């Protein structure tokens, strides 16, 4: 029994290729169902995100190998004119397991340690389970991957520290003010960057968020999504600057929208109570001289990127610990995988000795009392258990490579004169 995987990701193919191969949830279900119903695979699962489309398969026919699956996906997506086999990676046996473990704990991600990929892998398994294409092997593989990700999260610091500008801004605000639930926040700009910052703020328990934007309807839509319903007209927000403890700017402009004179007036009204200004604009939205004012903490994108770089450096330092966890789980998974290969021989061995026992006991069934027969049966069961203990232990013992398994199996089958294994048990 083997498991193979092929796919495209940010390491193997540019974005235009990844877009051509990407699968919707409907296509995901259709692809894995077709593979299994046709007998090409006994199990199948697809992990499809914005950065990767990866197919995991337990082959059902000898001709189903990595090259076959690459061609299958290209054909399914009608992408032969743009996508080539060279755009794909290939993995098999424990290499497939290692890859999924690395994907699940986010060391194979574009952003090291990002938190979304585990949920995406879980969704891939959910889809396969729903349509019935996740069998014993994929189920064990996925649950081991989930366990790896959990251990990485609890035993390492791989996922600690902000690695996006908007999240770094919020993390910095929390370090300065500690309890954001008590602070009043003004968001200037409701575009993508501002929206992310507002959502991160909300996730950190900031509930008093006021939004202003050139297009008021956009500010109102974001406010409604956050559940604040608090919006200031863009023309008049400067009249209220003194009311806010945290100001986030994220607008597209060539001119500073806040200058030192305006903020000095605001600070006077606040009686010098501290203010954090997080300038997420590019070009900058806030005059750098604002940062020189008393109790005014101004951080722009460059300052935040310095924080991000430090956090990424700390995450990279955790990689040896992460890889040690993966190696540990990979050994256990490989040993379990090997037991599947020897299971038919173990079943046949036990069946043969059980048959011998039954035949021999049958010869004495009418020659002894029921009590004596019961004792004989109990005795032979104990003898058989001891006789079979070492052969079964040897079959289950870890091996250096999967190539060593057939030699062990053949040795046992020849010694005990077992018939060809039942393929349905493999």
Curated annotation (Swiss-Prot):
Its EC number is 1.2.1.70. NADP(+) binds at residues 189-194. Belongs to the glutamyl-tRNA reductase family. Catalyzes the NADPH-dependent reduction of glutamyl-tRNA(Glu) to glutamate 1-semialdehyde (GSA). This is Glutamyl-tRNA reductase. Substrate binds at residues 49-52, 109, 114-116, 120. The active site is at residue 50. Keywords: Chlorophyll biosynthesis, NADP, Oxidoreductase, Porphyrin biosynthesis. Homodimer.
């Amino acid at each position: 029994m083997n498991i193979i995987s092929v796919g495209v990701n940010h390491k193997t193919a540019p974005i235009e290729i990844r877009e051509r191969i990407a699968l919707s949830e409907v296509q995901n279900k259709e692809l894995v169902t077709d593979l299994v119903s046709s007998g090409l695979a006994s199990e199948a699962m697809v992990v499809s995100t914005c950065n990767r489309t990866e197919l995991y398969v337990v082959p059902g026919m000898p001709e189903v190998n990595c090259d076959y699956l690459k061609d299958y996906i290209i054909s399914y997506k009608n992408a032969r004119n743009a996508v080539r086999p060279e755009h794909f990676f290939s993995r098999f046996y424990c290499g497939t397991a290692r890859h999924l473990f690395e994907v699940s704990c986010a060391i194979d991600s574009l952003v090291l340690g990002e938190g979304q990929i585990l949920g995406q892998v879980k969704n891939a398994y959910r889809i396969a389970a729903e349509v019935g294409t996740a069998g014993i092997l994929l189920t064990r593989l996925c649950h081991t991957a989930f366990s790896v990700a959990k251990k990485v999260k609890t035993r390492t610091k791989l996922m600690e520290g902000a690695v996006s500008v908007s999240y770094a801004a919020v993390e910095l605000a929390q370090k300065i003010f500690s309890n954001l639930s008590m602070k009043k926040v003004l968001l200037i700009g409701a575009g993508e960057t501002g929206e992310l910052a507002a959502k991160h703020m909300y996730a950190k328990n900031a509930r008093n968020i006021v939004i202003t934007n050139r297009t008021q309807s956009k500010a109102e839509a974001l406010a409604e999504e956050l559940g604040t319903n608090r919006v200031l007209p863009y023309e008049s927000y400067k009249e209220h600057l003194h009311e806010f403890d945290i100001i986030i700017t994220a607008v597209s402009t060539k001119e500073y929208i806040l200058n030192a004179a305006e903020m000095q007036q605001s600070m006077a009204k606040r009686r010098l109570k501290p203010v954090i200004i997080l300038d997420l604009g590019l070009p900058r939205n806030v005059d750098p001289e604002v940062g020189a004012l008393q109790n005014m903490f101004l951080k722009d994108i460059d300052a935040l990127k310095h924080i991000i770089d430090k956090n990424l450096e700390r995450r990279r330092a955790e990689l040896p610990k992460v890889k040690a966890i993966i190696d540990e789980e990979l050994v256990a998974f490989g040993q379990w995988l090997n037991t599947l290969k020897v299971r038919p021989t173990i079943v046949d061995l036990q069946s043969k000795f059980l048959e011998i026992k039954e035949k021999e006991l049958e010869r004495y069934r009418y020659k002894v009392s029921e009590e004596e027969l019961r004792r004989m049966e109990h005795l032979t069961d104990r003898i058989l258990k001891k006789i079979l203990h070492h052969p079964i232990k040897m079959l289950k013992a870890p091996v250096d490579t999967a190539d060593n398994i057939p030699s062990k199996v053949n040795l046992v089958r020849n010694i005990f004169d077992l018939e060809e294994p039942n393929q349905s048990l493999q």
